[in-house]
Amino acid sequence: MGDDLDHVRERLEGIAEELADLAIDRLRAAVDGNEGAAAEERRITRARRAVEKASNLLGSGSPDD
């Protein structure tokens, strides 16, 4: 795989980690009584999964995996 794709994959992995941290923060807020935080956490988690999927696709070398 080209260095450019490796770089993009690494950036996506970093973004996924940031999203995971944000999701944890929203869960903590939900426990503290923030009514909208649980819905935000679910949305952030869906986005994190999509970013992880994109990163995995770039790392696999095959779009059919």
Kindly give the residue locations of the regions a language model identified.
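N-terminal acidic leader/helix
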Residues: M1-L22
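Intrinsic disorder/low-complexity signal
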Residues: D3, E17, A39-E40, D64
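Acidic, Ser/Thr- and Gly-enriched intrinsically disordered low-complexity segments
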Residues: V8, P63-D65
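Compositionally biased amphipathic helical and low-complexity segments enriched in hydrophobic
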Residues: E13, A23, R28, L58-G59
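Short E/K-rich amphipathic alpha-helical oligomerization segments
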Residues: E18-A37
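Short, charge-rich amphipathic interface segments used for partner binding and complex assembly
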Residues: V31-P63
